[in-house]
Curated annotation (Swiss-Prot):
Function (record text): Inhibits RpoS proteolysis by regulating RssB activity, thereby increasing the stability of the sigma stress factor RpoS during magnesium starvation.
Organism field: Escherichia coli O17:K52:H18 (strain UMN026 / ExPEC)
GO cellular component, one term: cytoplasm
Family named by the database record: Belongs to the IraM/RssC family.
Protein name, entry field: Anti-adapter protein IraM
Alphabetic keyword roster: Cytoplasm, Stress response
Name of the coding gene: iraM
Length: 107
């Protein structure tokens, strides 16, 4: 079964990502990724992680829940990454980020 990423929220202090996805139904997944799944990404879940662009990547999925508009709005409103001011300077101003490679290309 293929899943399509609709939107993704990253919490840089804990390295957790939340993605709204479409599979058999619209869902929210909470996971610790080894890659950043951008909107429009298509992947297949497997026992050890996911297959994305014909390559297997390990990820830890913590929870999958049916999509809930209010929950997704809450996640989006608490999004810390990327901070808006970083777009001007191209530098990440989030001092406690644990993500090794910024998915937004910030330094």
């Amino acid at each position: 079964m293929k899943w399509i990423v609709i939107d993704t929220v990253i919490q840089p202090t804990c390295g957790i990502s939340f993605s709204a996805i479409w599979g058999d139904m619209k869902m929210i997944i909470w996971y610790q990724p080894t890659i950043f799944l951008t909107p429009g990404s298509i992947f297949t879940p497997v026992k050890s992680g996911i297959i994305f662009k014909d390559k297997e990547y390990p990820i830890t999925i913590y929870n999958i829940t049916p999509f809930n508009k209010d929950l997704w709005s809450l996640l989006k409103s608490s999004q810390e990454c990327p901070p808006g001011e970083s777009e001007i300077t191209n530098k990440c101003l989030h001092n406690s980020c644990i993500i090794k490679i910024c998915p937004y290309g910030l330094k």
